[in-house]
Amino acid sequence: MLPSATAQHAALPYPNAATPKAIDLGELKAQSGTTPISVTIALSLPQLNEAENLLKSLSTPGNPQYHQFLTRDQFVARFAPSNADVAKIIAGLANYGLMVERTSATTLKVTGLPADMERAFSVSLHSYEVPAHGNVAGYTFHAPLTRPTIPAEIAASVAAVVGLDSRPSYHPLTKVAPQALAKARSVRPASSGDAFGYLTVLDFAKYYDVDPLYKLGISGAGRTLGIMTLASFTPSDAFAYWKALGLSVNKNRIRIVNVDGGPGAPSDASGSLETTVDVEQSGGVAPGANIMVYQAPNTDEGFVDVFASAIDANSAETLSISWGSWEWFNNLENSPVTDPTTGKTVGITQAVHELLVRAGIQGQTVFAAAGDGGAYDANNDLGCFGPYSPSQPYSCSLTLSVDYPASDTAITAGGGTTLAGVQDFCLNTACTKTYAVNVPHERVWGWDYLEGLCAALGAPNPIACGIFPGGSGGGVSVSFVEPSYQIGLRGIQLSQPGQIFRAGEGIAEDDEIGSFYALPAHYPGRNVPDISFNADPDTGYIVYYTSSVSGFGIEPGWGGTSFVGPQLNGVSALLGQYLKGSRLGLLNSPLYGLALSGQAYRNPGAPLNVIGYGDNWFYYGRNGYSPAVGLGTLNVAKFAEILRGQF
């Protein structure tokens, strides 16, 4: 029997280009009609506009309310739906035979039989099977044939109904060098210590001005890091990594919180390396901090619930997530497409946005990886990374697109760079013929700088070589409007015209191909990312990891903006300790305020470094902000000094 996407402890593989189309098994109620299923109802914040205005005040240096954060109880009393509103929803759903439990201040867990769910939300649920492929086991899930409709009597209080579709939906944002180039790799020591591909958090600290904080005794002590993830991991890997680096850590520093039963046992196919990276990097940058790992199944329901769990608990001062999907991911199935300014019809992005607003009001700092698909993030969902076909040499999507949740205005998005230095590659097995790639300055991570190497290796184009569209996720959101902290900043851009995607591609192998839709042109959207660190696998890091296939190993050559998110998480813990235990909240206004003041880059003691070279296959680095790399890279100790002056 195949594992089910609704069963607890069943590790599900994350989707990629190799995932087969699902087989429609027919109506769910005919397959397992007596087995209850669950959905999460995300409750709307009744005074969302007031909450967003408060977040702006709390996050803006110089505002009288700057950093006057609310406690959990204060937030609930002021902004959460009332008990009367919740009772009305519970009563309304009880009319359909559904059971309701309040799982947080703003979420409800609804359980019932498939037929009752269908009646409540006006859908027909089908069961689907994804066959095994390669070393990846098959699994089943359920999904509606049409979009759900929220019952009229409760619709005003509901932001989202999430979980009627239980398939794995999100991708880890770790990246490894393409196989053709990895085989050609030859190691040369980097200028700052370890060789490229073998860097550690100690090298990160040297490159980005963290060491001065360590010399002051700052380690993140007294702080709690939160990791939000959709795959489990092996904690001993992280402890082995920290021990190898000589870091002194508390043996009881990690606490695991299983959300919705947890994601199942660790496995390569489910993305366990991602969680391993998150814990090793954040906990290595802040070795004195405690770590809470909130891990949920890789479903829409798990995605929303992992945010709700971490934010409602309010135990971690700083959080990060390194999973995502392209911004319009939920419009690919069962369109019609909705107005981009109002969010998706099922409300996943709206539900998470309201949770992120709450996090900022409570003083929690939240980071997201900006993506590894350059300016074309949709390729992670539309299948760019499948086998190269000479008959379809341009099978990748050229739709400019950004990753979610990095595109949300209430989160800090981490982009990626390539470190300066020389990279050596072998052009034959004996390595008697070599090719050197010289990167004279730290630059935007975009693998087009390797096109000469690809030509030398005989690859006919960047897709065949495996380098397109690898690079720092960045661009312009067409779902989230430009936030106040980006208004007036040079380099902020509007969305480009002529961007098309194909909607309604269907779930199952015999579904019809859908229509083409134009994304909004010249839309004044939120620009992504905000800040960057090294993320190029070719100037990347080692990971201590227990593979479900090959066992424990020390794996070199890893990168992706998945490293940047947890590194920022660790940095935030250091900053909190440096600032005498203060919470930092949403960091975007302080960061952008530096650029708007003109003091961000002007002297050796400046908090930001210009990344004026390179591109992410469309957007170029420049002096100041760019949608390729954000504001540049951070000098952490210098930024800490500036933050101290704002308290």
Locate predicted features.
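Polar, glycine-rich mid-to-C-terminal structural blocks
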Residues: 379, 407-409, 413-482
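Active-site-proximal helix/loop microenvironment
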Residues: 556-568
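Sec/Tat signal peptide C-region and signal peptidase I cleavage site
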Residues: 2-7
